[in-house]
Curated annotation (Swiss-Prot):
PROSITE patterns registered for this protein in UniProt: YCGL
Region (Disordered): 88-110
Residues in YcgL domain copies: 14-98
The protein's name: Protein YcgL
Pfam families recorded: YcgL (PF05166)
Source organism (scientific name): Salmonella schwarzengrund (strain CVM19633)
Compositional bias (Polar residues): 97-110
Length: 110
């Protein structure tokens, strides 16, 4: 009897390598391979500064990321080879305060 070998189809695991910007606080660059910035535009790299390795992360089997949408990261990595995570916009505490004061006064007028 002849033995038949069935080749295993291995799906390519999706990993990303995350770098912290040396020039911009809370700004991170996700790429597919360690130290491979070949698909990142030169202007972006110039503004990003010297990339500082933050972590390597498997994306498969993960449901979410801390400060980025997982599906957007995966899509950007496969389509353009990188994903840029910018810091969240600063809170406008004055606007929040005025909004809450306005709400409180409208309730007091009733």
């Amino acid at each position: 009897m002849r033995q038949v070998t069935i080749p295993l189809i291995q799906s390519k695991s999706m990993f990303c390598v995350i770098y912290r910007s040396s020039k911009r606080d809370q700004t991170y660059l996700y790429v597919e391979k360690k130290d491979d910035f070949s698909r990142v535009p030169e202007a972006l790299m110039k503004g990003f500064g010297q990339p500082q390795l933050a972590m390597m992360l498997p994306l498969d089997g993960r449901k979410k990321l801390v400060n980025a949408e997982l599906e957007k990261v995966k899509q950007a990595l496969s389509e353009q080879g990188y994903y840029l995570q910018l810091p969240p916009p600063p809170e406008d505490l004055l606007k929040q305060h005025l909004s809450s004061v306005g709400q409180n006064t409208s309730h007091a007028d009733r």
